[in-house]
Swiss-Prot record:
Keywords: Chaperone, Cytoplasm, Nickel insertion. It comes from Streptococcus salivarius (strain 57.I). This is Urease accessory protein UreD. UreD, UreF and UreG form a complex that acts as a GTP-hydrolysis-dependent molecular chaperone, activating the urease apoprotein by helping to assemble the nickel containing metallocenter of UreC. The UreE protein probably delivers the nickel. InterPro entries: UreD (IPR002669). The keyword Isomerase does not apply. It holds the Pfam family UreD. GO terms for molecular function: nickel cation binding. Its main location: cytoplasm. Belongs to the UreD family. GO terms for cellular component: cytoplasm.
Amino acid sequence: MTQAYDGFVHLGFSNRNGRTISHKKYQEGNSRVSADNSDANGVPYYFLINMGGGFVEGEQYQVTIDVNKDAHALVTTQTPTYVYKCEKGQLTHQNTSITLEENSYLEYMADEVIPYLRSRYFQTSRIDMDKSAHLIYSDGVTAGWSHEDLPFQYHYFRNLTQIYQDDELVYSDQTLLEPQKQDMFKLGYFEGWRNYNSLVMVSPNIDEAFVKALQKHLENLNLESDFAISSLDIPGLVLRILGKTAEDNRRVIYSCADYFRQEIHGLTPLNLRKNDMRR
């Protein structure tokens, strides 16, 4: 067992004769990975699994993903990330490290975090990618869970995502929520909604015309959630979503990802075998 972590996963993907294979699959502690062969395009597809059903106060987790030159992989979580209540005020932490080599492509579609009563959680993600690589990265957080079904009963949630290209920081996004100190329903926070998600896409094929076409495509779908798309300073975009349910938000996320897959890579729509997204 790696001493520093309660759960550890390391996945590596390589291109062999025009086909992506998993050359590394390592798991320790409470963390597991499970392969799925349902992707119609033959892309390696893995679920991240927590054997305890969620994170316990003070636990530390690490996810490492390496995608080598010309390889393409899809990684998602089996369920939302449940962060159980904290009785001693200890911080629970998960770190994700991703490396994308030349012309590689990773779709990392994490479900939302559901923080429990009084929980304290810090999530960090660092993506190091070649300028020719393609990335879809999503995550999110909800109003949480408590026995009384009251929203925002957790104490601390922080999510820091950073993307580097050739060792230069090109994207940094931080969400800091302290519901005991902030009015979570006011403008700039959840604004009456209960679920927040974001999706970042980085690709040399994304330009302003693509962003405008995607915006129009999503507007024509009559989706339930509120969302906004912004271009990045590099070829890419960020999509932010507020919705009534996690399922509503995922429909926006997958619609966006499907558009990119089809228009840029000629791939079929995602089929992540989630109960709310079966096709």
